[in-house]
């Protein structure tokens, strides 16, 4: 019934059901007096949605709370690179300065340059945006939001990435052996600093050719999969949504 409820009430309610994993997202994980919680844009939308949810138990009633869930409030302030305190959250804008590396568990780590500081960043497998992180190259300008993980004996301090917004993409240039203009075949290297030669016709070249490789990612915002959203994560459909209701009653 939750899946059906979401299909009817979306986008006035959100993050109720994960269609990709066929998973209900409104129920608590452990023993809890709260049976479920529906996130939405108004009192009317969440109360209406609750009437569509079937339960085997008789519920005592409901309460509606005004909250900052789905607002990304914790990521609105810029982090101070000269004073990155553990457990603080915010955003940074910088350029990729180390090649992304996939480590054990499928998590991806890279660093960005912000001013004169290098900040290590981690994109975790469960977010399902690790492929995006893997496709970053040196020089890409990105806007990241997340929280600072405390350094430990085995791991350095890292920004746990909660969103990745690509601002500018560098050209991905690959240097290759030149192509013979007569034979349309790749030339062979004659040795270190000796240039290239076509072994069919003898044409020579002294420099490699530049080939631009199309980028697999775009200039856009990438959010984690809905299953990895935190309570404050602002989903795509709420990016330009700003509720300004002052009256809060039923």
Residues covered by each model-derived region:
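Short cysteine-rich clusters marking metal-coordination/redox-active sites
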Residues: 180-183, 198-201
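Short alpha-helix capping/helix-loop boundary micro-motifs
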Residues: 77-83, 126-132
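Long, hydrophobic alpha/beta structural blocks
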Residues: 1-81
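OB-fold (S1/OB) nucleic-acid-binding surfaces
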Residues: 101-126
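OB-fold/S1-family single-stranded nucleic acid-binding modules
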Residues: 147-179
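Long, charge-rich boundary regions
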Residues: 131, 137, 209-250
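OB-fold and OB-like beta-barrel modules that bind single-stranded nucleic acids
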Residues: 89-98, 134-150, 161-164
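Structural detector for short beta-strands of small beta-barrel domains
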Residues: 52-57, 63, 86-106, 169-181
């Amino acid at each position: 019934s939750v899946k059906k409820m979401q299909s009817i009430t979306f986008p006035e309610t959100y993050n109720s059901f994960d269609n990709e994993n066929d998973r209900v997202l409104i129920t608590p994980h452990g023993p809890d007096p709260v049976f479920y919680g529906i996130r939405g844009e108004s009192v009317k939308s969440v109360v209406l949605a609750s009437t569509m949810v079937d339960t085997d138990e008789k519920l005592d009633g409901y309460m509606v709370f005004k909250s900052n869930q789905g607002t990304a409030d914790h990521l609105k302030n810029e982090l101070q690179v000269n004073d990155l305190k553990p457990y603080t959250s915010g955003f940074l804008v910088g350029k990729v300065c180390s090649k992304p590396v996939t480590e054990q568990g499928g998590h991806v780590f890279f660093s960005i340059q912000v001013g004169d500081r290098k900040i290590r960043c981690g994109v975790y497998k469960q977010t399902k945006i690790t492929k995006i992180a893997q496709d970053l190259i040196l020089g890409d300008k990105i806007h990241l939001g997340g929280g600072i993980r405390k350094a430990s004996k085995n791991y350095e301090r890292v920004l746990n990435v909660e969103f990745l917004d690509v601002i500018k993409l560098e050209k991905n240039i690959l240097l290759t052996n030149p192509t013979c203009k007569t034979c349309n075949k790749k030339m062979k290297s004659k040795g270190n600093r000796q240039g290239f030669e076509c072994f069919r016709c003898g044409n020579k070249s002294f420099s490699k050719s530049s080939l631009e490789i199309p980028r697999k990612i775009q200039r856009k915002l990438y959010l984690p999969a809905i299953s990895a959203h935190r309570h404050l994560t602002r989903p795509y459909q709420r990016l330009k949504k700003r509720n300004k209701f002052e009256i809060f009653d039923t």
